[in-house]
């Protein structure tokens, strides 16, 4: 049971880290800034292959 909770905690921390880095609960992949302008409000830039949504 402890292993299950440890895995659950790791998944929660990783998802929060992705949320914090990208500003959204989902990591939105992009190739150009134009991809992000269609997927995120506020015309964000594409950094390291992911949209910098706010």
From Swiss-Prot:
Record GO cellular component, one term: extracellular region
Secretion signal, residue range per the UniProt entry: 1-23
Compartments where located: Secreted
InterPro entries referenced in this protein's UniProt entry, alphabetically: Scorpion_toxin-like_sf (IPR036574)
Tissue specificity annotation: Expressed by the venom gland.
Swiss-Prot/TrEMBL keywords: Disulfide bond, Ion channel impairing toxin, Neurotoxin, Potassium channel impairing toxin, Secreted, Signal, Toxin
Chief site of localization: secreted
Top-rank lineage group of the source organism: Eukaryota
GO molecular function: potassium channel regulator activity; toxin activity
Post-translational modification: Probably has three disulfide bridges.
Family note: Belongs to the short scorpion toxin superfamily. Potassium channel inhibitor family. Alpha-KTx 14 subfamily.
Record note on domains: Has the structural arrangement of an alpha-helix connected to antiparallel beta-sheets by disulfide bonds (CS-alpha/beta).
Annotated function: Potential blocker of potassium channels.
Protein name stated in the entry: Potassium channel toxin alpha-KTx 14.1
Annotated organism of origin: Olivierus martensii
């Amino acid at each position: 049971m402890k292993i299950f909770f440890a895995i659950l905690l790791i998944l929660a921390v990783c998802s929060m880290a992705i949320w914090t880095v990208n500003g959204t609960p989902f990591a939105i992949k992009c190739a150009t800034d134009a991809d992000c302008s269609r997927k995120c409000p506020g015309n964000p830039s594409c950094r390291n292959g992911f949209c910098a949504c706010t």
